[in-house]
Each structure stands twice: as structure tokens, then as C-alpha cells.
Amino acid sequence: MWLTKPSTPVSALLLLALALSPPGTQGRPQRSLAARVAELRPELFLPVTGTRLPPRASRSTEIFPRDLTLKDKFIKHFTGPVTFSAECSKHFHRLYHNTRDCSTPAYYKRCARLLTRLAVSPLCSQT
């Protein structure tokens, strides 16, 4: 049997009852989502018994201390014994401490070549 269309007075009464009803009874409650979820499923927030989460530090990647003499070791290996005169020390320090070639491990070989060229340049071999 087909349902008949509700009459106009019945639908008007339903709309009037909906408009006059107090807030919070018309659909969803007036609480925050977190309060509703916590009320419905408190077991979501509790850890499973018998299991223990590892501490945060052990889950992250370990950071090993960097060898500060690594740069010196690499450059001495590539250049051999190189000495700089007192007049050339300013240029050496600028190159050694302030360039990408001498501060990035991937470019240490290039740094060694630059330091070798600086050592034999006319600027540094004036003595």
C-alpha cells in the first residue's frame, strides 16, 4: 500500500514544533566533538593492557656527534703538508672557514685543491 502525502496541517504542526523546541534537541547535541567521542568511546584513549610505547627518543633517528677534526684530516690527506706565510694567513682563513667548498664534506677535495693553489700562488709565495 502506498503512503499518502501528509496533509498540510500536519506538516505545519511539525514545522511549528521544530521551531519552538529548545536548542540541543533538534539534531546533534551542543557539545564539542571531543567530548562526544570521549563519552562514546573511552577505550580509544586508553593504551592496550600489557603493551608499552617506547620512549620518543628511541623512536627517532640517533644523531652521532660529528668529528670536529674530520675536516682537517681530509684536507691534510688530499693536500699533504701545506704551509702558508704570514701574509697569506688572511686569505687562508677566508677560504678555509667561509666557503662552501671547505665547510661541506662533499666538497673537501675541491677545498684541498683550492688551498694547494693558494699556497703556490704568487700572492703567498712572495717571501
UniProtKB/Swiss-Prot annotation:
Pfam families linked: ALKL1_2
Cysteines joined through disulfide linkages: C88-C124, C102-C111
InterPro entries, sorted: ALKL1/2 (IPR029364)
Signal peptide bounds: 1-27
Alphabetically ordered keywords of this record: Cell membrane, Cytokine, Disulfide bond, Membrane, Secreted, Signal
The keyword Mitochondrion is assigned to this record: no
One GO term describing the cellular component: plasma membrane
GO molecular function, one term: receptor tyrosine kinase binding
Location of this chain's protein in the cell: Secreted; Cell membrane
Role description: Cytokine that acts as a physiological ligand for receptor tyrosine kinase LTK, leading to its activation. Monomeric ALKAL1 binds to LTK, leading to LTK homodimerization and activation. In contrast to ALKAL2, does not act as a potent physiological ligand for ALK.
Family according to the record: Belongs to the ALKAL family.
Protein name per its UniProtKB record: ALK and LTK ligand 1
Organism annotation: Mus musculus
Gene label: Alkal1
